[in-house]
Curated annotation (Swiss-Prot):
Keywords: ATP-binding, Cytoplasm, Ligase, Nucleotide-binding, tRNA processing
GO cellular component: cytoplasm
Descriptive protein name: tRNA(Ile)-lysidine synthase
Entry similarity comment: Belongs to the tRNA(Ile)-lysidine synthase family.
Binding of ATP, residues: 27-32
Organism, as annotated: Legionella pneumophila subsp. pneumophila (strain Philadelphia 1 / ATCC 33152 / DSM 7513)
Pfam families: ATP_bind_3, TilS, TilS_C
Taxonomic lineage of the native organism: Bacteria, Pseudomonadati, Pseudomonadota, Gammaproteobacteria, Legionellales
MF terms in GO: ATP binding; tRNA(Ile)-lysidine synthase activity
Record carries keyword Nucleotide-binding: yes
Length: 433
């Protein structure tokens, strides 16, 4: 006879009650159906719920599944939205679909919101094994956490210590109906192969193996937390660092501790960790490079560079070089969606003067630019050097041209020819990237 416990403990109810809105990832499968029913049956939480169904468009049954989910939410009196998502299907479909899901969930979360997912103990065990087979370190083997940050809100997995069999028992008792996705039987997908071919053999030999593997993940989570504390102790600059990091404090550390600091820095910037080989390259080719060297290490549209005594992290939208564009709707904001640049114009006490009917264009450095500044004609290249702007950033600094004359280097200088102290005429151009 199956000994059951409440799927949602009083501690979890108290924890979830503090949020303004609980967004439930609702696929219609067993896990999310039980999760939604449990939450809807818990009075302190039932009025906080929003069920979100992601339609991946992979199966021919997708629309039927969406209708099923919508009807169940209608029966339970729960707000429901569905979203069809697009993602790259040319490579790892599982990973691409997952990333697209989480991106959409993240976009929904506001301050004091929580995304609640139905992952259970068996899912955790599978995740640990998949990470192990990939040669993951402590971060990967820590697998899924019960609580973590996501976007502006939080992510919670209240069933992570519950075996799937307990969810099945709950579903039978409450006569719940759920979707069986036919793709879950396809063993060409790694997780399905593990679930249907490997786990049954392990469970036959060691019946409690899923719980033991999950417990190992908890140990790895504690080790991960300890390593993060050590990283901050080794490099206090991590507390303030965003896309740049001071090199000097870490040069005297052992190799493994430098790697630990770099991992913390990349995770803080939401960058997927590279291979051990890449960490070796960052340390040997960049951190210990000659002072005047400017090496680069790249992976997956990410770059780590060095300029003087700092490491710099560049993401894909910071690597793409923007093209010139006319600012026809000035002073409305101007956005470069693929280059992480958004310009806005705000009134100022002194600053840039825009003549009436002027032609305004945003350009970027190509070489040879000059600006009349502080009573002299100066080469932009020399000014960038004086301002100690990293070389790769120089090509991305917006240049405001008015009637084909360089009038403003955004964030740094306004040409004397276009400078005014008249508050009625003065503008400040701000790069909000």
């Amino acid at each position: 006879m199956l000994v059951t416990r409440p799927l949602l403990s009083p501690e979890w109810v108290a924890r979830l009650k503090q949020f303004k809105k609980l967004i439930v990832g609702f696929s219609g499968g067993l896990d999310s159906t039980v999760l939604l029913h449990v939450l809807a049956s818990t009075p302190p939480l039932s009025n906080q719920l929003l069920a979100v169904h992601i339609n991946h468009g992979i199966s021919g049954n997708s629309l039927n599944w969406q209708r099923h989910c919508e009807q169940l939410c209608l029966d339970l009196g729960i707000a429901f939205i569905a979203k069809a998502i697009e993602f790259d299907r040319s490579a790892n479909v599982e990973e691409a679909a997952r990333n697209a899901r989480y991106d959409f969930f993240s976009s929904l979360l506001e301050d004091n919101d929580c995304l609640v997912l139905g992952h259970h103990l068996d899912d955790q065990a599978e995740t640990v094994l998949l990470q192990l087979f990939r040669g993951a370190g402590v971060d990967g083997l820590a697998a899924m956490q019960e609580c973590s940050n996501l976007g502006a809100g939080q992510l919670a997995r209240p069933f992570l210590t519950c075996p799937r069999v307990e969810l099945e028992h709950y579903a039978r008792i409450h006569e719940l109906k759920w979707i069986e996705d036919e793709s879950n039987q396809d063993t060409k997908y790694s997780r399905n192969y593990l679930r249907h071919r490997v786990m049954p053999l392990l469970l036959e030999k060691w019946p409690g193996v899923a719980g033991n593997i999950s417990r190992a993940a908890t140990h790895c989570q504690q080790a991960k937390a300890n390593l993060e504390v050590l990283a901050i102790k080794d490099c206090p600059d991590l507390l303030n660092a965003t896309d740049h990091l001071l090199i000097e404090p870490i040069k005297g550390l052992e190799f493994e501790r430098i790697t630990n600091v770099l991992k913390f820095w990349l995770k803080k910037n939401r960058i997927q960790l590279p291979s051990s080989k890449t960490f070796h390259r960052i340390i040997h080719e960049i951190i210990f490079a000659k002072l005047d060297a400017m090496p680069t290490v790249s992976w997956n549209q990410i770059q780590v560079r060095r300029f003087q005594q700092h490491l710099y992290l560049l993401k894909a939208d910071q690597i793409n070089l923007p093209k010139a564009i006319k600012w026809q709707q000035f002073p409305a904001s101007l956005t470069y969606p693929d280059a992480d640049i958004k310009l806005s114009a705000v009134k100022a006490q002194k600053g840039l003067m825009i003549p009436k009917d002027a032609q305004i264009e945003i350009r970027f450095r190509k070489g040879g630019e000059e600006i009349y500044w502080h009573g002299q004609t100066k080469h932009l290249k020399k000014l960038f050097q004086e301002w100690q702007i990293p070389p790769w950033v120089r090509d991305r600094v917006p240049l405001v041209y008015i009637n084909d004359q360089l009038a403003c280097v955004v964030g740094y200088a306004v040409s004397d020819l276009f400078f005014t102290t008249n508050p009625l005429e003065a503008w400040s151009i701000v790069n909000n990237s």
